[in-house]
Amino acid sequence: MSSRRPGCAGRGRTVEVDAPRAFLLQTVTRLCLNELDSARARREESRGDRLPEPVDLGLLGGDAVEALDQISMAFLVLLQRLTPAERAVLLLHEVFEMSHSEIGALLEKSEAACRQLLGRARAHLASERRGLRTSREEHRRLLLAFVEASRNGEMDRMLTLLAEDATLVIDTGPDGKRLGRIRNVGRPVEGATRIAAFLAAVARQIPAFGEARECVLNGEPAVVYVREGRPAAAILISAAEGRIRRVFVQVDAGRLGHLGLRQ
């Protein structure tokens, strides 16, 4: 395998790569770590929460759908809470089935350090994901009922659907802290009562959010609001024991434009 690397006066030079897989993994891993460090710094600077892009698996087709079927929005959000190094070790070990020695060479860390990072990542994900499982039918029922209740501003009904310690996360974009005329939406809303009150206020101030379309995102039931033929918001949840534990609302147009919106 040949690779182009920058040389003098902006020209590239060709080098032979003996181990293409290792070279590609190292290059991509380094680029991802740099981007993660940069993204983490941007999030801290903006003091807002960002959500991963919702993924329409139907647009990928084939093996990709099967491989990504278990990557729920809740799991991707949990991954974001790991440090870049923890995330890299977890994915390289679990997805690419690399040994600790291979990962250590890639990240320039000792095997012991990689084992420790993997252990921390697994422990964190296990503690956060514990109990966040429900049947697809129950998941869909809770989602549709919650979307209807929130759209109509029905606080009492929302309270019957939300867990007491539920969390609402709204991503309005890298610079946005406003939803319509409602300010300060860059931080999660904690607790069922606060979430219901907040969404009731949204329903009063933004009565025509668009047409609600049921779809599947990240392998899970979801609802996308469509306005003038374009996605305006995507709503996903995680649930356990018959109650909604997390509500994820993506309204950043830059992270919605790729959705297929198939009928």
Pin down the residues of each PLM region:
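Hydrophobic pocket/interface hotspot
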Residues: 158-159, 166, 242
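Short, solvent-exposed coil/turn elements at secondary-structure transition points
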Residues: 50-53, 172-174, 228, 250
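C-terminal regulatory/effector modules of DNA-binding transcriptional regulators
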Residues: 199-263
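A solvent-exposed, acidic/Ser-Thr-rich amphipathic alpha-helical stretch
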Residues: 164-206, 212
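Alpha-helix boundary/capping residues
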Residues: 31, 162-165, 202, 263
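Active-site-adjacent scaffolding segments
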Residues: 1-148, 154-157, 161
